[in-house]
Amino acid sequence: MINFIHIKNDLKQVFRDPIMSVLLFAPLLIIAIFKLLIVFLFPFIATKFNFDLSLYYQYLMAGILILISGMLGIVIGFMMLDDKDGNIAELMAVTPLGRSGYLVNRLSFSSILCFIYSIIAIYVLNVIDVPFYTILLLSILSGVYSIIIGLLIFSGADDKVKGLTFAKGLNMLGIFAFSDLFALNWFSIWFLVNIFQLSD
C-alpha cells in the first residue's frame, strides 16, 4: 500500500536538491515548449519550406513520452542513491514498512508522476488521435519505463555523479524509438511508435 506521508517526505527530499527539482518539473516545461512549436513554428516551416512535420507527430509524441519517463527515472534513481548513502534502505528493512514497502513507495513516486505527465502531454499537445484505453496503456508503459531507469541507475551507480553519467547513457536508448524512420526493424525499442500506428 502506498503511504502518502512517505510521498510527502519524498517531495521534501527532491526540493532540497536543485537537479532533482529541475528534473521533476522539466516535463511540464518540455510540454509547453513543444506545444508552442506545434502551434507557431511547425505551420511556418510547412508554409515557408513546404515540409509537413505533421507526418512525424507520432514519433514526436513517442520521443516526448520517453523523455518524460527518463527524467523522472533519474529523479527516483537519485533519491535511492541518497538513501543508499544514508543507509535508509537498511533502516527501513527493520520497520513495519519493510524493504518491499520501501521500494513500492519509492518507485510509485516516479511512476504516478510519469503516468500523470504522460496523460497531460498527450492531451495538451493533441497531435495524435488514439482511443482513451491506448492513452492509459501508453501512460502505464511510461511509468514502468521510469521505474526501470531508476532501478538501473540505482544498481549501476555509486553516487550522483556516476548516476548522472549512467542516466545519460540509459536515456540514449530513447533514440531507438525512431528506428522506424531508418527501416531498421531489428531495433528492439519500437513499441511506442507501433502502438500509435496500430491505433490509427
Regions found by a protein language model. Name each.
Residues 16-43, 59-75, 168-179:
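Hydrophobic alpha-helical transmembrane segments of multi-pass membrane transport/permease proteins
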Residues 140-181:
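A structural motif at transmembrane helix-loop-helix junctions in multipass membrane proteins
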Residues 80, 89-92, 124, 153, ...:
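Hydrophobic alpha-helical interface/terminus motif in multipass membrane transporters
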Residues 21-24, 60-61, 104, 108, ...:
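Hydrophobic alpha-helical transmembrane segments
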Residues 40-41, 46-53, 179-200:
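Terminal transmembrane helical anchor/hairpin motif
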Residues 110-151, 155-156:
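Secretory targeting signals
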Residues 1-21:
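N-terminal Sec/SRP start-transfer signal
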Residues 56-94, 99-121:
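Hydrophobic alpha-helical transmembrane segments of multi-pass membrane transport proteins
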